[in-house]
Design a protein with these regions (language model features):
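ATP/nucleoside-binding phosphotransfer catalytic cores, i.e., glycine-rich phosphate-binding loops
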Residues: 254-256, 260-264
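Juxtamembrane cytosolic/matrix-side boundary and N-terminal portion
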Residues: 297-315
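A transmembrane-helix-recognition feature enriched in membrane-embedded lipid enzymes
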Residues: 1-46, 311-333
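Juxtamembrane amphipathic/hinge helix adjacent to a transmembrane helix
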Residues: 263-303
């Protein structure tokens, strides 16, 4: 669906460029925003657990997510649809291979970062990431930056991660892999403000206008699929699997609780993924996430307005019809 939405807005981009801060660069490209809105058309039900991230959608945050399949991105897009304007103010870090997919050009225009994996590219990619953040994050008024610290899909990295854990006397993980430090460290170094925080935007002890710019929170997201069977994009498009309820767990950490030193930050990241392992182990045994300490486990079913979904889908068909008419006109003019 991504190219159709980009195609719909393409004829108007010269006009939209006059209002870059509001439409194109500041709030995300119309094509990308609308393509995100089409995701619920192919996803199943999503149930949310843990902290309520709506409380921090006006603040800057780095979002850490476990990675099992390509469908994780679609799940996140759906979860964000009822979280206000933050869905239009996000930056994504994704594998460079996605640059060559149908939504690659949309992500490029949106200002997302494509990162190459492997030791041969690691140092160079971190330098490029730092420059990319300096160029695009502030200028396009981004709020959240999303990354997958494991550096790849679970099925591809599990064996290597377990061997590394055994060699370094680290916990044996089955449902996640040990995260990599590089990108997370660059993001924290580049985007941290000088003021420590501890209260979400709108809280009693802090007013938004008094806050300095900079990351305020780390949002730790754990995605779980029933029977540990993740959904990829092909499955959603072809629809050859029974409807699935995807579960998403949130934890919010004040940025002041995140250490800056590399060794301490590595330990902190490892602890987050060890906690993810415990969360997923509990989920696969019981079908539910355990409650946070001192709280009762409460799930929230994520729902969207059906009329809104119909409108978004209609826009997709409209874009196709519009380009059919445009191409047909030029064909008759030329031939």
């Amino acid at each position: 669906m991504h190219p159709e939405f980009l195609n719909f807005t393409a004829p108007f981009l010269p006009c939209l460029s006059l209002y870059q801060s509001d439409l194109h660069f500041g709030g995300g490209t119309p094509g990308f925003t609308l393509s995100q809105s089409s995701v619920p058309m192919v996803t199943g039900l999503v149930v949310e657990w843990g902290d309520d991230v709506k409380a921090v959608t006006e603040d800057e945050a780095v979002v850490l997510v476990n990675h099992q399949a390509t469908g994780d991105v679609c799940t996140l897009m759906m979860c964000l649809q009822d979280k206000g304007m933050v869905v239009r103010q996000m930056m994504w870090l994704m594998d460079h291979i996605f640059k060559y997919t149908n939504f690659g050009i949309v992500s490029l225009i949106h200002g997302d970062f494509f990162i190459r994996q492997g030791k041969a590219h690691r140092d160079q990619q971190l330098v490029l990431l730092e420059k990319h953040l300096e160029k695009y994050y502030r200028s396009r008024s981004r709020k959240w930056i999303v990354l997958f610290p494991e550096g790849g899909f679970l099925r591809k990295r599990r064996e290597t991660s377990q061997a590394f854990a055994k060699k370094n006397n680290l916990p044996f993980l089955q449902h996640v892999t040990l995260p990599r430090l590089g990108a997370t460290q660059v993001i924290l170094k580049s985007l941290l403000g000088q003021q420590e925080n501890g209260t979400p935007a709108g809280g009693d002890s802090m007013k938004a206008e008094n806050k300095l710019k900079g990351l305020q929170w780390v949002i730790d997201i754990t995605i779980a699929y029933p029977r540990a069977e993740p959904i990829d994009i092909q499955t959603w498009i072809l629809g050859y699997r029974q409807p699935t309820i995807t579960h998403v767990h949130y934890r919010i950490f004040p940025i002041k609780d995140v250490p800056a030193e590399p060794e301490a930050l590595t330990h902190w990241l490892y602890q987050r993924f060890i906690e993810k392992e415990d969360l997923l182990s509990h989920f696969y045994k019981t079908g539910a996430f355990p409650p946070l300490q001192g709280q009762t486990a409460v799930s929230r079913e994520m729902t969207l307005n059906n009329l809104w979904l119909v409108g978004i889908q209609s826009l997709a068909f409209l874009s196709g019809g519009m380009w059919y008419c445009i191409l047909r006109y030029f064909y008759h003019c030329l031939f």
